[in-house]
Amino acid sequence: MARLKDVYQNEVVQKLRAEFNYKNIMEVPRIEKVVINMGLGEAIQNVKILDSAASELGKITGQKAVITKAKKSIASFKLREGMPIGCMVTLRRERMYEFLDRLMNVALARVRDFKGVSGKAFDGQGNYTLGIKEQLIFPEINYDEIDKIKGLNVTIVTSAKNDEEGKALLKHMGMPFRN
């Protein structure tokens, strides 16, 4: 069992039940999925960038990345509908907990001048989105093998009803929020 899942089941559930006075254990918010997205606008000119990004995302998550395509044509960006412009991975269950554990305890600690993540990046329904400026903070990525520094977005989807519950869930699980 993943370490973070064990922490959630044995510690976080009790803390949240006491904090929000939940009567039923199924009311306690939980993390449903983690979506990691890498948007690459420069993939319009060079498709090889997309292949390297997908392989790096696969190394980071342990799961094959899906290529995302443009939904609309935008003439000013020289973009046509259906052109590949990014890649994403959706993690659930064990892999999700393993990734979050590595993100919170290893990767975020490797960010330069890290003071904690913003507590304002919630969407109103208890979901949290975190932007990462470079993929080098993950230990799976070798500095010598990358051709370009790319950023990525990590969205943590929870079953929380509001931002307050979502923030409490992530805080108890070990997300390093700024004070």
Curated annotation (Swiss-Prot):
Q: Which family does it belong to?
A: Belongs to the universal ribosomal protein uL5 family.
Asked if the record carries the keyword Ribonucleoprotein, the reply is yes
Q: How does it assemble?
A: Part of the 50S ribosomal subunit; part of the 5S rRNA/L5/L18/L25 subcomplex. Contacts the 5S rRNA and the P site tRNA. Forms a bridge to the 30S subunit in the 70S ribosome.
InterPro entries named in the record = Ribosomal_uL5, Ribosomal_uL5_bac-type, Ribosomal_uL5_C, Ribosomal_uL5_CS, Ribosomal_uL5_dom_sf, Ribosomal_uL5_N
Q: Where is the signal peptide?
A: none
Q: Which GO terms describe its molecular function?
A: rRNA binding; structural constituent of ribosome; tRNA binding
Provide the function of this protein.
Answer: This is one of the proteins that bind and probably mediate the attachment of the 5S RNA into the large ribosomal subunit, where it forms part of the central protuberance. In the 70S ribosome it contacts protein S13 of the 30S subunit (bridge B1b), connecting the 2 subunits; this bridge is implicated in subunit movement. Contacts the P site tRNA; the 5S rRNA and some of its associated proteins might help stabilize positioning of ribosome-bound tRNAs.
Keywords recorded for this protein, A-Z: Ribonucleoprotein, Ribosomal protein, RNA-binding, rRNA-binding, tRNA-binding
Q: Name one GO cellular component term.
A: ribosome
Q: Which SUPFAM superfamilies match?
A: RL5-like
Q: What is this protein called?
A: Large ribosomal subunit protein uL5
Tell me the Gene Ontology biological-process terms attached to this UniProt entry: translation
